[in-house]
């Protein structure tokens, strides 16, 4: 079983529910919702719709997984999950919670009262991603039966327990500013399908700026075996659609920074990142999207 959704609602809830059966609630990381608010979320969602919950930052950032200090906060998160009928709780620690704190993490996961909830942990920072850090994670998480959460296109998890839980933040220089290509989504599917026989299967949660479109395309691919068009437009028309969404005047550098991460389909099955098309163009300030299109025709062979 492979389940696909987004981290938060990138579109209206009604539009989201029409397409997906899963969402990771992120607002719970910043604020404890009232019982009434949580009940409203559950009531508005379809009966079989599934929520996963990102645990409040009190647990991971303020109390840094110190179990006695974090226990009350964790109980509040569990209460939210009960209202939502959520089974999975995501703990995300900051980059300052380095690998030297592995014992605190293991003690937390070993002794916190989980009840029937499944805990997954997303680490941040380079100390968890080298050989030593990954081994420490693998050893500790196997003892406490907790899945390590990563973007598997960047880094494979150190340990996967009863569930594979992947969060896709993007592969670009700047976190979140990214759109996945068809080839990358195919690779993601090949990874996910290796874990779909797990007790809870594989959960794929997109958390990049193009999360809704990427999740939609990925779900379509799983169900149909091929990808839908990005926009229905190709070549210069597809480029025009993207570059018309920014303000002018704009320098080439600002265009690359703001929208260069987007994908353009030059023709069916042929994708290129917009930054690759803009890079050969002259360094200047563009007054309009039409001026960019004129230069593209002169400098780029489409």
Where are these regions (language model features)?
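Residues lining hydrophobic/aromatic ligand-binding pockets adjacent to catalytic sites
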Residues: 1-234, 245-246, 269, 287
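Basic helix-extension-helix modules of the SAP/HeH family
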Residues: 230-302
């Amino acid at each position: 079983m492979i389940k696909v959704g987004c981290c938060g609602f990138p579109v209206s809830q009604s539009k989201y529910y029409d397409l997906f059966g899963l969402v990771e609630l992120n607002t719970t990381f910043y604020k404890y919702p009232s019982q009434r608010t949580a009940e409203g979320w559950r009531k508005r969602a379809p009966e079989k719709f599934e929520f996963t919950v990102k645990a409040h930052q009190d647990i991971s950032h303020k109390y840094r997984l110190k179990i006695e200090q974090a226990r009350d906060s964790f109980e509040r998160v569990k209460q939210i999950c009960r209202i939502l009928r959520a089974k999975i709780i995501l703990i995300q620690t900051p980059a300052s919670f380095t690998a030297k704190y592995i014992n605190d993490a293991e003690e937390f996961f070993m002794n916190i009262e989980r009840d029937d909830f499944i805990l997954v942990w997303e680490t941040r920072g380079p100390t968890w991603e080298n050989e030593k850090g990954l081994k420490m994670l693998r050893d500790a998480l196997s003892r406490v039966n907790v899945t390590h959460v990563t973007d598997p296109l960047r880094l494979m998890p150190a340990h996967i327990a009863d569930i594979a839980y992947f969060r896709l933040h993007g592969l670009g220089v700047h976190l979140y500013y990214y759109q996945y290509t068809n080839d990358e989504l195919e690779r993601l599917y090949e990874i996910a399908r290796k874990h779909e026989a797990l007790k809870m299967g594989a959960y794929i949660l997109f958390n990049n700026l193009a999360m809704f479109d990427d999740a939609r395309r990925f779900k379509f691919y799983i169900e149909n075996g091929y990808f839908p068009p990005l926009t229905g437009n190709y070549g210069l028309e597809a480029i025009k659609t993207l570059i018309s969404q920014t303000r002018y005047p704009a320098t080439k550098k600002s265009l690359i920074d703001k929208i260069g991460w987007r994908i353009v389909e030059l023709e069916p099955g042929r994708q290129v990142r917009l930054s690759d098309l803009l890079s050969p163009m002259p360094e200047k300030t563009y007054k309009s999207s039409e001026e960019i299109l004129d230069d593209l025709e002169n400098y780029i062979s489409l």
